[in-house]
């Protein structure tokens, strides 16, 4: 596994550019299980970053609908969805190395064959590796809300990001977001409503009930017990 999660960007004169990123790089401490999974399973399930388009059919060994999840955490929900939907292929992106290791280990436990994972900046993967008009769904569950106003620009859901996601979705494909921070949910709605050729799937023009396709995480269950809300937002590409 190549540890090159953050790639540099340069201007035409070769000077490094500072890029505002939506995540904080946290290496964390690996458990033995996570390290073993990275050592043994990354060559089978992991996908190295490269600045060229993926052949998704070749990657999974078949032609099937592809779901992309950005920021899968420890991978519990992603592995569950892959297990419950064997007719679909799942590609997960996560920058937290212990989370990648945990996801790989869980995938092996469940004997999952329709899952591949990457450890790299999702924006660069989308821009350089994901073919246009190819994805059935993009999932973004509980991204960092960057609570402080001065950090709001770091939120991943911004108009250019929404446009980028749209270009990777098939017509009819869906961008599904979820957050437990209401101001971020409102921000997501504002951004998505401002981008052409998306249709909000909410009957009321705001949020949708949690679809059964999105598993409830332990974190979410704990929040529910404490009275915290969760907002699901789903927009379909219509053109």
Swiss-Prot record:
Which pathway is it part of?
Answer: tRNA modification; N(7)-methylguanine-tRNA biosynthesis
Q: Which InterPro entries match?
A: SAM-dependent_MTases_sf, tRNA_(Gua-N-7)_MeTrfase_Trmb, tRNA_methyltr_TrmB_bact
- Write out the GO cellular component annotations: tRNA methyltransferase complex
Q: Which PROSITE patterns does the annotation name?
A: SAM_MT_TRMB (PS51625)
* Classification via Pfam families: Methyltransf_4 (PF02390)
Family named by the database record: Belongs to the class I-like SAM-binding methyltransferase superfamily. TrmB family.
Per UniProt, subunit arrangement is:
Monomer.
Name it.
Answer: tRNA (guanine-N(7)-)-methyltransferase
List the gene name: trmB
């Amino acid at each position: 596994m190549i540890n090159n999660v953050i790639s540099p960007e340069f201007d035409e004169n070769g000077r490094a550019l500072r890029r505002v990123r939506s995540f904080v790089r946290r290496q964390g401490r690996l458990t033995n299980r996570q390290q073993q999974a990275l050592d043994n399973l990354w060559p089978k399930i992991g996908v190295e970053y490269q600045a060229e388009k993926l052949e998704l059919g070749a990657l999974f060994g078949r032609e099937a609908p592809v779901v992309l999840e950005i920021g899968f955490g420890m991978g519990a929900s992603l592995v569950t969805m892959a297990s419950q939907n064997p007719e679909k292929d799942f590609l997960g992106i996560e920058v937290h190395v212990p989370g990648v290791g945990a996801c790989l280990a869980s995938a092996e436990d469940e004997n999952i064959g329709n899952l591949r994972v990457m450890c790299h900046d999702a924006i660069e993967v989308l821009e350089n590796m994901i073919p246009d008009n190819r994805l059935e769904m993009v999932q973004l569950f509980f991204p960092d809300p960057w609570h402080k106003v001065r950090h709001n620009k770091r939120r991943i859901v911004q108009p250019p990001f929404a446009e980028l996601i749209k270009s990777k979705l098939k017509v009819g494909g869906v961008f599904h977001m979820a957050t437990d921070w209401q101001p971020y949910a409102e921000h997501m709605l504002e951004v998505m409503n401002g981008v052409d050729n998306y249709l909000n799937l909410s009957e009321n023009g705001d949020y949708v009930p949690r679809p059964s396709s999105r598993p409830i995480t332990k974190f979410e269950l704990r929040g529910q017990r404490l009275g915290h809300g969760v907002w699901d937002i789903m927009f379909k590409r219509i053109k």
